[in-house]
């Protein structure tokens, strides 16, 4: 299957499909960074490559893939790294799964499953619990956290600095929520690196804030406990 998608949220949608579709068949997301009217539009070649990739038997058992700019990678790790350039989609540390040569996919590795990957069955899910993303900054207080909860959020993702860092006021409020079993996941706004286990809140591990949001919402929809959610993220 090939899914054409706007590039701004392509990585988020592809990740959602990756953790909800449990099938050996490939799902390939593709988009374009340049409009069709550009002198060197990238859309037509990207689409041809994506269709060729989806039809390849070597693409089986690799989960959801993202294909742009003559390269393809796992939706589990790939993110958008630049607002305008055609080589924007990358997995900074994990790397690409392969490239295209004369519109034919060439794989660098045999099929493998990302460490820690979980798949959710959403066949009977009609709506997902509300999870919001809050941006961490200096001198931040807990007001937005409380406002999000009052507005119906069942979980929160903090897009923190560095290793999911937050200030003392926010950390104190998260510690209180920990005791209530309310999940707050601490991600990082850097483009690479893990967020390690936390005393206050849940470290996001390898997941970006947007991917953490999907994962937390899916976990809540299946009734996972706070401890199970923490274990799923790795901390």
Name every feature range the model reports, one short phrase each:
Residues 1-10, 151-163:
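Short acidic, glycine-rich surface-loop motifs adjacent to enzyme active sites
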Residues 3-25, 166-175:
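Short Gly/Thr/Asp-enriched flexible loops that form oxyanion-binding sites at enzyme active sites
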Residues 6-7, 32-35, 161-163, 188-193:
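Short, ordered loop/turn segments at secondary-structure junctions
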Residues 14-45, 51-55, 179-188:
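Short, acidic/small-residue loops that bind anionic groups at enzyme active sites
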Residues 30-101:
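Internal gly/pro-rich beta-alpha loop/helix module
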Residues 74-155, 163:
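Accessory alpha-helical/coil subdomains and C-terminal extensions
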Residues 163-235:
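C-terminal non-catalytic interaction/assembly regions of soluble proteins
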């Amino acid at each position: 299957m090939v899914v054409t998608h706007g590039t701004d949220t392509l990585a988020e949608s592809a990740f959602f499909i990756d953790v909800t579709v449990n099938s050996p068949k490939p799902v390939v997301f593709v988009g374009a960074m340049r409009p069709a009217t550009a002198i060197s539009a990238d859309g037509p070649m990207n689409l041809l490559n994506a269709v060729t990739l989806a039809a390849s038997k070597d693409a089986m058992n690799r989960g959801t893939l993202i294909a742009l700019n003559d390269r393809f990678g796992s939706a589990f790790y790939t993110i958008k790294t630049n607002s305008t350039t055609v080589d924007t989609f990358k997995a900074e540390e994990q790397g690409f799964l392969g490239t295209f040569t004369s519109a034919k996919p060439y794989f660098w590795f045999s099929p493998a499953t990302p460490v820690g990957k979980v798949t959710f069955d959403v066949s009977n899910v009609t709506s997902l619990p509300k999870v919001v993303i809050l941006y961490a900054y200096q001198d931040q207080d807990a007001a937005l956290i409380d406002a999000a909860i009052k507005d119906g959020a069942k979980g929160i993702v903090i897009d923190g600095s560095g290793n999911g860092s937050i200030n003392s006021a926010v950390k104190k409020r998260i510690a209180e929520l920990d005791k209530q079993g309310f999940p707050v996941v601490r991600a990082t706004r850097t483009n690479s690196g893990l967020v390690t286990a936390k005393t206050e809140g849940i470290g996001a591990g390898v997941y970006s804030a947007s991917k953490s949001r999907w994962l937390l919402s899916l976990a809540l929809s299946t009734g996972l406990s706070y401890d199970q959610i923490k274990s799923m993220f790795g901390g």
